[in-house]
Amino acid sequence: MGTSARRALWLLLALCWALRESGATATGRKTKCEASQFQCTNGRCITQLWKCDGDEDCVDGSDEKNCVKKTCAESDFVCNNGQCIPNRWQCDGDPDCEDGSDESPEQCHMRTCRINEISCGARSTQCIPVSWRCDGESDCDSGEDEENCGNVTCSSDEFTCSSGRCISRNFVCNGQDDCSDGSDELDCAPPTCGAHEFQCSTSSCIPISWVCDDDADCSDQSDESLEQCGRQPVIHTKCPASEIQCGSGECIHKKWRCDGDPDCKDGSDEVNCPSRTCRPDQFECEDGSCIHGSRQCNGIRDCVDGSDEVNCKNVNQCLGPGKFKCRSGECIDISKVCNQEQDCRDWSDEPLKECHVNECLVNNGGCSHICKDSVIGYECDCAAGFELIDRKTCGDIDECQNPGICSQICINLKGGYKCECSRGYQMDLATGVCKAVGKEPSLIFTNRRDIRKIGLERKEYIQLVEQLRNTVALDADIAAQKLFWADVSQKAIFSASIDDKVGRHVKMIDNVYNPAAIAVDWVYKTIYWTDAASRTISVATLDGAKRKFLFNSDLREPASIAVDPLSGFVYWSDWGEPAKIEKAGMNGFDRRPLVTVDIQWPNGITLDLIKSRLYWLDSKLHMLSSVDLNGQDRRIVLKSLEFLAHPLALTIFEDRVYWIDGENEAVYGANKFTGSELATLVNNLNDAQDIIVYHELVQPSGKNWCEEDMENGGCEYLCLPAPQINEHSPKYTCSCPNGYHLEENGRECQSTATTVTYSETKDTNTTEISPTSGLVPGEINVTTAVSEVSVPPKGTSAAWAILPLLLLAMAAVGGYLMWRNWQHKNMKSMNFDNPVYLKTTEEDLSIDIGRHSASVGHTYPAISVVSTDDDLA
């Protein structure tokens, strides 16, 4: 074979190899799939979970070849088609088998309801909890659970409204419409007060001792009026330099003055304001506020009233299946494409090789699911539950990434998802909501001078605690059936048993200067609170015997607070400048910011422990928002100037969020995912400040690690839960009172006595500074006479090492001077005054032995003759 023939043969082999490689690449055979994927014979990558699952996901079916016959576990239900599903999914009203065999009448007609459940009828396979019967909400598909319920009968200490609603008899003829139909205020005699009471202009009664005490107790402030007291009430609040004081006494940021949005209770921040005009680059909302011009018609409501999104026209007219956009920019109707006429300037509507060619006929156009042919070209589409991941290949949609897709638990399935409920809840098949099983949940809220409760199902409305002064914060230990609240006028935290008669309560914690919010740790039995006056966050045992500052720095206007003892974290809001929401360990460690942008007045926060999210109210932005517990996935639930005029506090239960609005003096409720289904639960309130849901499922049980091995975790003072950052995190740590610190054993406390040492010429003095604050009644007894030397800073040990050498040097110098003195006494000396060095002999020699001096050693004099009399004196 000649050289030219061999060369041609090599070229032919190289060409064949290149064609083989290009073919392999074209079919995707050389495409490398990820470790969690399976590679089809045709090169496509699918998730390993889809291999041998009974569905052909590879177009060539290679994912279902050589599969071992699948057997279901004992805890599974076997569908007629061989599919396996959990047993609990059988006969739950939701078909989970592809053939629907798990919900077939043959399978489900023999189903018997469990204890504490009732059947929805002879022809129904549905069971619901007994507590859902006659609760005012249809839970059976047939509505049978709300039939033959009869009229609600109120108890002897309740009043029956015309609507059938039950309210406390204390609410009758109190000057407020508590029935919401006015029937509790009909035929009322003129109100009278007792001999030791004062009657407000609103007819309500308060103790006579509360009159003219510079604290308005009447809702109309008539007890502190000029006519009653002969003087204006003294306002004790002193606002910082960055804030201004409202006529009603509270402080707000200076920048909120004359911004078009009333922030003071009396609206005094918007009085005598100059007329506002927007800049040329701004858009003026209908309410007069200004936003940047670029925010108009951006698809987001930036104006509170939404006027920036009114009358917006779609700029892009080529959206939708009936439009075609030319490459030259024109937009034409799809019917004009491939009609053999020039409708685009560049003829892009008439490509000869592409018109009326059905690409879907060849290999389904390369689409993994659905191929849709069009006049020019084609497009791939996916079946329900799938989405395009590379314009041709369909992948499963993880619907569970949407927090509101399921009420509680979401399980992602191939092409779909399954919703389930947490323990203690059961799904209402009519609504898909996970509803609590057991006692009726209720809302408990403060109303300044009393604490009230309203049932969320039967709407029973009663008074729990009365004759209070100025209640601002509220929480509960539900397992112990105890309420806790803070009274800003009495500067204390109180408690009462929820089953006790109205009026019986005990002072637990005193000297709380200006409590803003409280949060009860129901597992470790402690209470946390924010204090706006001292700018601190504190923690104490529920009996108030032990307490301490958890944080007393970097706080400006601490407001709401919430705890999660199951994970060991505490969360709080701060509306100071800059406003923020923070989180930290409940032991005071691992402090970090959670929300720092687009936040101005975060008044109330609450935790959704089931969905692991934090919700908060912004009174300045009139907004209800949420984030996950790491500060990610932020969502706006509701933005409303009407229902969020001045929101103060909120709470969450099931799929609903409830909040108090101070300006509207009402309690509202809405869907926690969408903000829809708005409803008014209570109105005509009097300075309501805080609200909670009362139900055993609100506070899930957890292990108190401080009582697991030894009492109080072996701690001398407080035992606090540690943040569970990872599996190696400690369960708890010991903590000491203010002015004390933990010893090396991590359990015992010792006084933090600071030793300050300073030096002077010829002398050294030590001053001991003892702690001056932090000890409270009930704290540990540590004798202050025992001083402590704190751990020396780096380098101090070296100074102690050379101290003996310095003492030896001083002794040598002293001996030398004594010898010189003896020598001078035995010889004559002459002293010549040098006109140049006019210094006295007292300045001739200076020996500085101070530890902190810049120069250590001798300073030699300018005169050679030295007198030692002064040195030895």
Swiss-Prot record:
It holds the Pfam family FXa_inhibition. The keyword Lipid metabolism applies. It is a single-pass type I membrane protein. It comes from the Eukaryota. Keywords: Cholesterol metabolism, Coated pit, Disulfide bond, EGF-like domain, Endocytosis, Glycoprotein, Isopeptide bond, Lipid metabolism, Lipid transport, Membrane, Receptor, Repeat, Signal, Steroid metabolism, Sterol metabolism, Transmembrane, Transmembrane helix, Transport, Ubl conjugation, VLDL. Residues 28-797 are extracellular. This is Very low-density lipoprotein receptor. It comes from Oryctolagus cuniculus (Rabbit). The lineage of its organism: Eukaryota, Metazoa, Chordata, Craniata, Vertebrata. The gene is VLDLR.
